[in-house]
Amino acid sequence: MAHKKGTGSTRNGRDSNSKRLGVKAFGGESVTAGSILIRQRGTSVLPGVNVGKGKDDTLFALTDGFVKFESIKRGLRNRKRINITAAV
């Protein structure tokens, strides 16, 4: 019989670094061309007018202007789209 408690092992003890996803420029905000608007995984928000999409689904401004979100009906679910309206 052991007179000392055996050391157990665990499969925990690690965690991944946060990826800092989310909206970076909110509705009505002024942005410049090239500004990152949303970092996302997949296209939960679709690119609209004057908005580009990177290979990692990041949305960015193609022109200077103001951020405008809109809801669109697509299929059975509503989707969001982000546009850049021209700065006046």
Swiss-Prot record:
Q: Which UniProt keywords apply?
A: Ribonucleoprotein, Ribosomal protein
Which ranges form a coiled coil? none
User: A cellular component term (GO) from this record?
Assistant: cytosolic large ribosomal subunit
The record's disulfide annotation reads: none
Residues annotated as region Disordered? 1-23
Q: Which GO terms describe its molecular function?
A: structural constituent of ribosome
Which stretch is the leader sequence? none
Q: Which Gene3D superfamilies match?
A: 2.40.50.100
Does Ribosomal protein show up as a keyword for this record?
yes
Gene Ontology BP terms: translation
| HAMAP family per the UniProt record, alphabetical | Ribosomal_bL27
Q: Which family does it belong to?
A: Belongs to the bacterial ribosomal protein bL27 family.
Tell me what this protein is called: Large ribosomal subunit protein bL27
Originating organism:
Synechococcus sp. (strain CC9902)
